[in-house]
Amino acid sequence: VMHPDGTREYCSLKDCDYHDIAIFLKNIKTVCEESCVCCMEEIHAIFGSSAKSTFSFGETFGVLQGLLIALEIPYHLVPPKTWQKEIWINQDKVVKNSGGKKGTDNKATSINAARRLFPTEDFRRNGKCKSVDDNKCDATLICEYGRRKCL
């Protein structure tokens, strides 16, 4: 969550269950009142993923949409390429070689962009983690996209 003053709060499904997320969203809506808007990444099945992981991914997406609808929080679905085009700059990009093909390493590129835009932010999931959480970076960048587009 990015508040109007730019401060951020995080709630991860790795640390919380759906009930915790519902309480988190309800509290955010109470604090933000009418200015509360959510931006979520528009997801699709990932080629090569197992049926189980695709189902789990879709279930989580559906539950989050359901919570937003139930709490009457307006939301926007943003395709990954849309927010990435707005947020990433050439200096952020990391190229990877996979099977002889070059392509953008989306996780590393988002981490670079998040560090550039929010240099004082700790992007670890919690204080015990040693590495940066790319999901937290993506969530922050999607919020920043929404802020820039006045969504």
Q: PLM features: what roles do these ranges have?
A:
Residues 1-151:
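Phosphate- and other anionic-substrate recognition elements at nucleic-acid/protein interfaces
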